[in-house]
Amino acid sequence: MSDSNPHVVGINVLKQNGLDVDELVKELIQNAAVEFTAYYYFTNLRAHCTGMEGEGLKGIIEDARLEDLSHFESCLERIYQLGGILPNDATEFIKISGCEFLQLPTNPTDHKAILEKCLKAEQGAIVNWNKICQMTFGKDPVT
């Protein structure tokens, strides 16, 4: 345990393994912001899926939405385990995500455009999580 904060678990072991814990917390906070923003965004997109085709898309978007919520909550747990905290200001938190692309399409009921937005969001998540995987590989079996 950390000498400076007895509530933080395993920090010294992670540092001994060569992990920059502060950088990891920073990346986890950014990923939490991305996942939270994506959850909000997918919730909004789902509401615009109307008609026969739209009803079919709702299930796909719901799966992505719930996955993003789960990832957000997982990030939170690990951030606090590592001694980090989230910003108190929700606007600041969302800005950290850098998710300007997460806007409704010009035509908010254009199902193809909605799917393209979903795909872009998921591609971004893969890049973000790969960065964390590379950072923690062989150093942090929990994250």
PLM features: residue spans?
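Mobile beta-alpha loop/short-helix "lid" or hinge segments that flank ligand
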Residues: 5-7, 90-97, 131
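Conserved alpha-helical segments that form or flank metal/cofactor-binding pockets of metalloenzymes
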Residues: 38-92
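Glycine-rich tight-turn/loop motif centered on a GG-T
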Residues: 17, 53-63, 101-109
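Acidic, low-complexity proline/glycine-rich segments
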Residues: 1-12
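Acidic/histidine-rich alpha-helical segments that form the ligand environment
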Residues: 27-34, 38-41, 45, 77-78, ...
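Glycine-rich anion/phosphate-binding loops
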Residues: 23-27, 69
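His/Met- and acidic-residue-enriched segments that coordinate or traffic transition-metal cofactors
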Residues: 13-18, 25
